[in-house]
């Protein structure tokens, strides 16, 4: 099922910065928030407990990639935090992804990263030595992710349709790199607007700087949410 709330990437360096940002929103508004490496390493597991205590949903974006037993053990710990979604690198392999699923259990969504949205085809071929097209690599990883029993993948919106065709229509496609028209793309090579992401079939979208660095973050969030959901029935 699609998520009507854009996921806000909390790319902040400290707990206090997050508190200041969230204080801008009405206390009763339930948000979907992404906690990435920078914030998690700075604030620790307490940041997740804090956000959940405020009634928000949490996507813990740590992109685990290690031997299967280590990932399984780490996922057991994350499951106790009450996260709503977390992820691994598909490049870790099917056995690692299965171990992650077992460790996390079924109460949270588990998705995999295929290729980072900052990766171009030339970079993939040169540095990863994967001599296929970028799309072929993404489809391969998506199939392996489905095989491992995960809920979906992180992918660019340009890849959503081919991934759902290669797996199944209910396979989650979470799309970062979302930018409203006219906003600088930053360091991500493959980007799309919220309306385009909806039309192409994305299930979740992640938006960071266009909200967190906006002059009015609350207005920016609602404008993006309106664009994302404008054609929903």
Swiss-Prot record:
Reactions catalysed: orotidine 5'-phosphate + H(+) = UMP + CO2
Record key words, sorted: Decarboxylase, Lyase, Pyrimidine biosynthesis
Positions contributing to substrate binding: 11, 34, 61-70, 117, 179, 188, 208-209
Superkingdom in the source lineage: Bacteria
The keyword Coiled coil appears for this protein: no
PROSITE patterns the UniProt entry points to: OMPDECASE
InterPro entries cross-referenced by the UniProt entry: Aldolase_TIM, OMPdecase, OMPdecase_AS, OMPdecase_bac, OMPdeCOase_dom, RibuloseP-bd_barrel
Active site: 63 (proton donor)
NCBIfam families reported in the protein's UniProt record: PRK00230.1, pyrF
UniProt record similarity statement: Belongs to the OMP decarboxylase family. Type 1 subfamily.
Annotated protein name in UniProt: Orotidine 5'-phosphate decarboxylase
Organism, scientific name: Streptococcus pneumoniae serotype 19F (strain G54)
